[in-house]
Amino acid sequence: MSPTGFTRAAAAPPPTLSRHAADTARLAAPLAIAQLSQMAMSVTDTVLLGSLGPDALAAGGLGANLSFVVVTLLQGVLTSVSVSVAHARGAMAEDRVPHIYWTGFALSLLLAVPAFALLSFAQPLLLAFGEPAALARNVGEYAAVLRFAAPGSLIGVGLMRSFLPAIGAAKRLLWVSLAGVGVNAFLNYGLIHGAFGLPRLGFLGSATATTITIWLTAITLVALLHGRSTFRHFVAATRPRLPLMGELFGIGWPVAITYGVESTLFLATGLTVGVLGESSLAAHQIALNVASVAFMVPLAIGQAANVRVGYWAGAGAPVAARHAGFVALGLGVAFMSLSGLVLIVAPHAIVGLYLKLDDPANARTVVLATSLLGIAAVFQIVDGMQTVGSGCLRGLKDTRVPMLAAMLGYWGIGFPTGYWFAFHAGLGARGLWWGLAAGLASVAMLMTWRFHRKSAALGVRADARGQA
C-alpha cells in the first residue's frame, strides 16, 4: 500500500476481493463518522433552539433546513473533484491533481454566489409560498446569517470531502468533524444564552455559531492539507483552468440534480403524510430519522466506491474497477441488511427512544411508527444499494444516465405508487413508505444494471486496445 492508502497499479497486481473490501471499509469509516458528526451538529442546534420555545425552533429549524438544501445541492457539483483526482492518480498523472484542486477551489467560490443570493431572499420566497409573515421574517433573519457560511461550507464540506479521500487523507475529515461538534455546541449555547462571556443573540446565536463553526472547519482542513508535507505536492500553487472547470461542472451538475430529485421526493412525502394527521406525521419523522442515521454508512461506502472505482478505471484496470464497485455494493447491502434486521427485531425499543411507550396519548403513533420501521427494513437495503451504485457510476464519470434513472424511479414510480397505496388502497402512511421502497428499489436495480454494463464495456474496450 502507498502512504495514502491506495495500491499502486504499476507496482502491484490488482487487489483481491478481500483487499478491496478492507480498503473500501478503511476509506468509508472516517467519512461515515464525519457525516454522523454533521448530523450531531444539526441535533445540537435543534435541542438548543428548542430551549427558546416553539417559535424559535420553528424559525431556526426551517432556516437551517433551507440553507442545508441549497448548499447540499451545490455540493453535488463538487463530487466531480474526487473522481477526477482518483482517475489522475490511477493513471500515474499526479501532476494533474493540483490543477484539479485549485480549479475545484475556484468552482466552490463561484457556487457560493447563487447560494448566498438564494438565502438572501428567504423571506420573500416564504411569503410567496403563503407562510405567515412573522415566521417568514424570522426565517429570513436566520438565513441571512447562514448565507455567510455558504463559501465555508462549499470549501470545507463540498470540496474537502471530495478531495481529501481521493488523496488518502480522509482521517483528517474525521477528527476535524468530531472537534466541530464540540465547538458548535459550545458556541451555540454561549451565543444563544449569553454564556461564557459571549454576547446573547437569542435564536440568531445558533445561526452565528453554525457559521463560525463551518468557517473554522474549512480553515482547519485547508491548513492541515497545505501544512502537511505528505500532501503538499497535491496542492502546489497553480492557476485554475477554465476547460477543466467546465469538465468538473459537466460531471457534477447531474449529481446536484439527482440530489434535488431525491430531496424533493422525501419533502413531498413528508408534506403528504402531514395531510393524514399529526400521529402519522410524527411516526413518519421517527422512521425517517432512524433511516437517515443508518443511511450515513452506505453513503460513505458510495463515496469510497467513487474514489476506488475511479482510481482503478484511471489505472486502466477495468477488472479491478469492476471488482471495487461490486465489493462496495456488497458491503452496502450487507450493512443495511444488518441494520434492517435490528429494525425488525427491536422496533419498540427504537421508538421508545423518541416517545414514552406507556403514554396512552402516544399509542397510535407508536403502533404506526413500529409498522413503518418494518417497511424501513426493506427500504434501507435498496436505499443503500442505490446510493452505493450511484457512487460506483460516478467513479466511471457516468452521471447523466443515473440522473435520469433517479427521475424515473423517484417520480415516475416511487411517489405515484406511494400516493395510490396511501389514498386509493387505504394504507395511509404505510402506503407512502411502500412507494418510497418501490422507487428506491427501481433506482437501485437501474444503478446496478448500469454499472454492470458500463464496467463490462470498460473491460471489452481495454481488451480491444490490448489486442491492437
From Swiss-Prot:
Gene Ontology MF terms in the entry: antiporter activity; xenobiotic transmembrane transporter activity
Which keywords annotate this record? Antiport, Cell inner membrane, Cell membrane, Ion transport, Membrane, Transmembrane, Transmembrane helix, Transport
InterPro entries per the record?
Answer: MATE_fam, MATE_MdtK, MdtK-like
Q: Membrane-crossing residues?
A: 57-79, 100-122, 142-164, 173-195, 205-227, 248-270, 280-302, 323-345, 360-382, 401-423, 433-452
Q: Which NCBIfam families match?
A: matE
Name the protein family: Belongs to the multi antimicrobial extrusion (MATE) (TC 2.A.66.1) family.
Name of the protein: Probable multidrug resistance protein NorM
Which gene holds the coding sequence for this protein? Answer: norM
